[in-house]
């Protein structure tokens, strides 16, 4: 799903750079699909990887967003706690020819409005 979404965005905006903020959902999914997530996320120009949204799950020892992050080959990548996202976004430089997307099934959607408003002030 992530790979298909990012590929579609690339096709829609072929001359633009792609920046993605991704929040993994569930410890079990992160554990089971870390390699696939890393491969899909390596196709962006800049990656902001957030901590795992646990939903109903308890943490699994050794399962953090780091297991995805270490295998991502995107040219620029950063690992953040979701509480750090807005401060990070205040300092990020996005070019005119850049698309920014949020991806995830956790609570990353609550950042869409604030990020959009922030990016408008930078335009």
Segments the model singles out, each with a brief description of its role:
Residues 1-123:
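ATP-dependent carboxylate-amine ligase
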């Amino acid at each position: 799903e992530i790979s298909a979404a990012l590929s579609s965005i690339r096709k829609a905006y072929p001359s633009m750079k792609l920046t993605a903020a991704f929040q993994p959902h569930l410890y079990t999914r992160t554990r089971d699909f870390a390699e696939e997530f890393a491969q899909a996320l390596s196709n962006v120009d800049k990656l902001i990887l957030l901590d795992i949204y646990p939903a109903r799950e308890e943490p699994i020892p050794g399962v953090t967003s780091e297991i995805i992050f270490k295998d991502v080959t995107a040219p620029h990548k950063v690992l953040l706690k979701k509480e750090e996202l807005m401060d990070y976004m205040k300092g990020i430089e996005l070019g005119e020819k850049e698309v920014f997307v949020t991806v995830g099934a956790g609570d990353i959607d609550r950042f869409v409005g604030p990020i959009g408003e922030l990016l408008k002030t930078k335009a």
